[in-house]
Amino acid sequence: MTELTKEYIDNLKKIIEEKDDVKARELLKDLYPADIAEIYQKLDLQEAIYLYMLMDGEQAADVLMELDEEDRHKLLKELPNELIAKRFVDNMETDDAVDLMRELDEDTQEEILSHIEDVEQAGDIVDLLKYDEDTAGGLMGTEMIVVNENWSMPKCIDEMRKQAEEVN
């Protein structure tokens, strides 16, 4: 794990200032989302946006969910809703996408939903948003695992592991 020292942060800021995409991606690629979220707190908003644009969609979505709500709002406020849909929501598990959408006003939710490429995911998000956050419906996801009722327990467990990898 990379230690997030002052020197590391200063080096990253220099790389951002120089707009060295290759070096910045190299520094980010092995970091955990929680570490990148910690780095975010030491950057100004434009530096953070620059880094987000360099990450692949899955990493960007994971980092976004690691940010505290206030930092998430600052970032999302600066990005177009179409980009939020394509960069974050399209790369999130449905339950995480719903959690994110709950933080936004209804107009923003509708606009983001209109840009989600996966129509089924958009429908699932709309369905889950109907439930209060603290109810079973508000906490659940829509992904499920199916096994044959006649299978042995070890076969069921193997199949569940296989399907879980496909869902994730």
Residue ranges and their predicted role:
Residues 1-168:
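Hydrophobic packing positions in regular secondary-structure scaffolds
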